Regions:
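Generic hydrophobic transmembrane alpha-helix motif, especially the helices
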Residues: 126-162, 169-170
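Hydrophobic alpha-helical transmembrane segments of polytopic membrane proteins
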Residues: 233-270
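Transmembrane-helix boundary motif in ABC transporter permease subunits
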Residues: 95-125
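Periplasmic/extracellular loop-to-transmembrane helix junction in inner-membrane transport proteins
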Residues: 22, 50-98
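Transmembrane alpha-helices
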Residues: 153, 157, 190-223, 250, ...
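Hydrophobic alpha-helical elements at and bordering transmembrane segments
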Residues: 82-86, 90, 120-127, 167, ...
Length: 287
């Protein structure tokens, strides 16, 4: 067989398909996650028990669980119940998160539409963001008191910046080709924004929402550290004064769960709305 015949025959042999790495199914991944968590809790419990570590230093997971049971089983009207504190903190977080995100995204839209607005606003926004939010809390308490309003205002300030910056970056990420095509068809400014600019910016906006969510929780709790009657941050300070370390850990577990739950909800919305984004397609293929 000649060299040409060998080459032709080789060209007809289908190339070996590369095997993609096997990704565990969602149910298997969930089981693996729970197994890791259970193993860590077991090691933690055994270590504290065997070393006889003082629970003021590091409480056992069983003690933290009992603190959670006590907090959730106490009458809702009592001071020991966790429910009033969760309701207070969540109202501060959600209200400030919605208003701050809407304000940041709204001003980002205006700034992209009018370059002068962005030029004038950006120095003030960056200067405000450079200030630690906890440093603004005492001033907000002087202005608005120890109640809901001061925490609400601080959460707005904390969530505004991620949406403002990410919104501008997303709106400016639109390529010239689609814009010129829409303009050539005589599309209005609103049609271009709603059909091209805003959908293109959605991955950036969701990234800003995820960052803002973390800032909302941390800023609300930090403001509650400085004063108030209700809130998970207030509860942590009271427990710190009584050396109730298992109680402090239990409140931290609640905050971690709240953050995880909000992240899951945002992730679900992102997958439903921005399913066409390359990152979401890659995640869908991995499943």
């Amino acid at each position: 067989m000649s060299t040409d015949q060998l080459t032709a025959a080789a060209s007809r042999v289908p190339p070996k398909q590369r095997r993609s790495p096997r990704v565990p199914r969602p149910s298997a991944r969930v089981l693996l996650l729970f197994a890791i968590i259970a193993a860590l809790i077991t090691v933690w419990e055994a270590t504290v028990t065997l070393t006889k570590t003082n629970e003021i230093i590091l409480p056992k997971p069983s003690s933290i669980f009992l603190a959670l049971v006590d907090g959730f089983s106490a009458p809702v009207t009592s001071r020991a119940s966790y429910f009033p504190h969760i309701r207070q903190t969540m109202s501060e977080v959600l209200a400030g998160y919605v208003v701050g995100s809407a304000a940041g995204l709204g001003l980002a839209t205006i700034s992209v539409r009018f370059a002068l607005v962005e030029y004038l606003l950006r120095p003030f926004v960056v200067a405000l963001q450079s200030m630690p939010k906890i440093a603004l809390a005492p001033l907000l308490i002087v202005w608005f008191g120890f109640g809901f309003n001061s925490k609400f205002a601080l959460v707005i300030l904390a969530t505004f910046f991620p949406l403002f910056v990410n919104g501008i970056a997303g709106f400016k990420s639109v390529e010239e080709g689609p814009l010129r095509m829409m303009q050539s068809f005589g599309a209005s400014a609103w049609q271009i924004f709603s059909k091209v600019t805003f959908p293109t910016a959605l991955p950036y906006i969701f990234a800003g929402l995820e960052i803002g969510m973390v800032h909302a929780i941390t800023s609300a709790v930090a403001a509650e550290f400085l004063g108030g009657q209700l809130g998970l941050g207030v509860e942590i300070i009271i427990m710190e004064q009584t050396l109730d370390v298992p109680g402090i850990f239990s409140v931290l577990m609640i905050l971690a769960f709240i953050g995880w739950l909000m992240s899951v909800l945002l992730g679900y919305l992102r997958r439903r709305i921005v399913y066409w984004a390359p990152v979401e397609r890659a995640r869908a293929d991995a499943r």
